[in-house]
Amino acid sequence: MTSSVSRPSGRRADELRKVALTRHYTKHAEGSVLVEFGDTKVLCTASVAERVPEFLRERGQGWLTAEYGMLPRATHTRSDREAARGKQTGRTQEIQRLIGRALRAVFDLEALGPRTLHIDCDVIQADGGTRTASITGAFVAAHDAVSTLIAAGKLTRSPITDHVAAISVGVYEGAPVLDLDYAEDSRCDTDMNVVMTGAGGFVEVQGTAEGVPFSRAEMNALLDLAQGGIAELVQLQKDVLGASHA
């Protein structure tokens, strides 16, 4: 591995894109956030339903589930809406399950009570890292939805146990880099998505060699990069939530 690399964006190997989290982006959902990782923009909403899936009836606990989708022109060329095709792609199903798992990792579902938190992540513009941006933004939307429940007297305490955020890392031109945009993601040798809690626990690691297999040393370097990047994202979440932080 090389110690430095020339990235298309001009960023350092360990530098995130400009990240922004805009709360209360829409007025109807209990929680809504526009998350921006550079040119990737995702609208994340959290909606509360006072019911649970059939498999959780009579258990006295809640549930959190997620859906993910991309607008037809979120990418360079237009894609048909999945609804028009009559089914979701495997990629869509994989990503929305990942988002749900990531958020459930930091929720006490018993404390949530017999209700469901529906997370919707809609990609407005894609430039790499849509799933990691979705997780990072969805946490803030979920936090705001919980705050709404507390303010309404439906919860006495927050069921959120920690922060959760996600980032992509990869081996690009022989060097480990943080937060890949599309130009890097489409040409990298290794692509990895990492989900971690604020306390530093790993929720999920998805890593794939796109051509050249990666070594244990490269994997360790990628995880170190991801850990540093996620720490920055968690701090941003805390800064954005401010006094309302649970």
From Swiss-Prot:
Domain of life from the UniProt record: Bacteria
EC number: 2.7.7.56
Keyword RNA-binding among UniProt keywords: yes
Xref: Gene3D superfamilies: GHMP Kinase, N-terminal domain
Keyword entries, A-Z: Nucleotidyltransferase, RNA-binding, rRNA processing, Transferase, tRNA processing, tRNA-binding
Entry keyword Membrane: no
Reaction catalysis annotation: tRNA(n+1) + phosphate = tRNA(n) + a ribonucleoside 5'-diphosphate
Annotated Pfam families: RNase_PH (PF01138), RNase_PH_C (PF03725)
Positions with a binding annotation for phosphate: R91, G129, T130, R131
BP GO annotations: rRNA catabolic process; rRNA processing; tRNA processing
Database matches in InterPro entries: ExoRNase_PH_dom1, ExoRNase_PH_dom2, ExoRNase_PH_dom2_sf, PNPase/RNase_PH_dom_sf, Ribosomal_Su5_D2-typ_SF, RNase_PH, RNase_PH_bac-type, RNase_PH_CS
GO molecular function: 3'-5'-RNA exonuclease activity; tRNA binding; tRNA nucleotidyltransferase activity
Class of enzymatic activity (EC top level): transferase
Alphabetized SUPFAM superfamilies for the sequence: Ribonuclease PH domain 2-like, Ribosomal protein S5 domain 2-like
Family from the record: Belongs to the RNase PH family.
Biological role: Phosphorolytic 3'-5' exoribonuclease that plays an important role in tRNA 3'-end maturation. Removes nucleotide residues following the 3'-CCA terminus of tRNAs; can also add nucleotides to the ends of RNA molecules by using nucleoside diphosphates as substrates, but this may not be physiologically important. Probably plays a role in initiation of 16S rRNA degradation (leading to ribosome degradation) during starvation.
Assembly and oligomerization: Homohexameric ring arranged as a trimer of dimers.
Listed name of the protein: Ribonuclease PH
Underlying gene: rph
